[in-house]
From Swiss-Prot:
Belongs to the glycosyl hydrolase 24 family. It holds the Pfam family Phage_lysozyme. Coiled coil: none annotated. InterPro entries: Bacteriophage_GH24, Endolysin_T4_type, Glyco_hydro_24, Lysozyme-like_dom_sf, Lysozyme_dom_sf, SAR_endolysin-like. GO terms for cellular component: host cell plasma membrane; membrane. It comes from Bacteriophage PS119. The keyword Hydrolase applies. The active site is at E37 (proton donor/acceptor), D46 (proton donor/acceptor). GO terms for biological process: cell wall macromolecule catabolic process; defense response to bacterium; killing of cells of another organism; peptidoglycan catabolic process. Disulfide bonds: none annotated. Signal-arrest-release (SAR) endolysin with lysozyme activity that degrades host peptidoglycans and participates with the pinholin and spanin proteins in the sequential events which lead to programmed host cell lysis releasing the mature viral particles. Once the pinholin has permeabilized the host cell membrane, the SAR-endolysin is released into the periplasm where it breaks down the peptidoglycan layer. It comes from the Viruses. This is SAR-endolysin.
Amino acid sequence: MAMSPALRNSVMAAISGGAIAIASVLITGPGGNDGLEGVRYKPYKDVVGVLTVCYGHTGKDIMPGKTYTEAECKALLNKDLITVARQINPYIKVDIPETTRGALYSFVYNVGAGNFRTSTLLRKINQGDIKGACDQLRRWTYAGGKQWKGLMTRREVERDVCLWGKQ
């Protein structure tokens, strides 16, 4: 599935804000609830049983039964993306475009830094093979041992943005 024109335009507008801004727009979408994660203000269990809230935030700080505000959700996302950046930036040993970095932040926000650090995707980045690294995103479409259409769509969008700097 191709990226919607509205999401494409929003991501392009975020480029000047850097990789965290790009990842944030990918996750939240142009309308704030139509991105790669969607938003839910009440905690719920995701497809693999992890307590989740807002734009996919997980962690011990989630309060079951609480209804989160949009501002709280955006603050959690920003905090989470700053954490993602700190976790993965030291492992990226080559210069990459901000669009590639933003797509990687979105990806790692979804799969976790541990998975990224041991991935072929990271190895390809550090070998200077940006296209090969971006193509690796298509392999990450499973959760709980099952392939998910939503993850397939997400990875295609992330791959598209990942490759923007190569075009």
